Amino acid sequence: MGARIKFTVGRLRTDRVHHVGEEDVRVVLSRLPDALYQRLRAVHFNDRGRARTFGYVTRGRREIVLCALPPRMGLGRALVHGETPESFGAKRGAKWPRLALRRFMLYDVFLHELGHLQIADAMASSDRLRFAREKLAHEFATEWRHRLWSERFDHEDPVHNRPSADELEKLGAMAGAV
């Protein structure tokens, strides 16, 4: 699985941090069918998103870039139709806990970018039309997040499972204390 995939980490220029790393991405890839990431050649972690871009696919549609983000932030505005902060372990209107940020980066951003590597129309005359665009990439991420989180995954890092009832209960208690 994915031994051929190259990982690089760029220098951070500010207080932004990489919330996930190579091992996190490898765990996600290990849970997916090989065919879904056969085009993937590299995953880069860089600081070029300026906290506005979470990730992107390079022009050749073979590399994914995950961008550094501030240590604490709220991502409510980044969510699209059908997604809630609670589905990642965060509370609406508040800064997201580190675990929720990591879940979002792996099971939303990374899967979304992997969705862009999927061929949508093999007969298309251009790369722009050949590969999945935003709607299909979002659907890909949503479908695979639901599949992967539908059953508990035995791993010591809770980022690889949906938020537990205990985790969500603590969020509710924190909201009441604020």
Predicted features and spans:
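A metal-dependent hydrolase signature that marks the N-terminal structural subdomain at the beginning
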Residues: 1-79, 92-99
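Long, well-structured alpha-helical subdomains associated
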Residues: 2, 6, 10, 19, ...
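Hydrophobic (often cysteine-bearing) scaffold residues that line and stabilize catalytic clefts
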Residues: 21, 107, 133
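Charged, glycine/proline-rich intrinsically disordered loops and linkers
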Residues: 76-94, 167-176
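Short pre-active-site segment immediately N-terminal to the catalytic Zn-binding motif
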Residues: 85-110, 123-129
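Active-site recognition of the HExxH zinc-binding catalytic motif
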Residues: 108-121, 137
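Short conserved catalytic/interaction loops centered on acidic-Pro-aromatic/His motifs
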Residues: 121-134, 152-156
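An active-site-proximal "capping" alpha-helix that borders the catalytic cofactor pocket
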Residues: 132-147
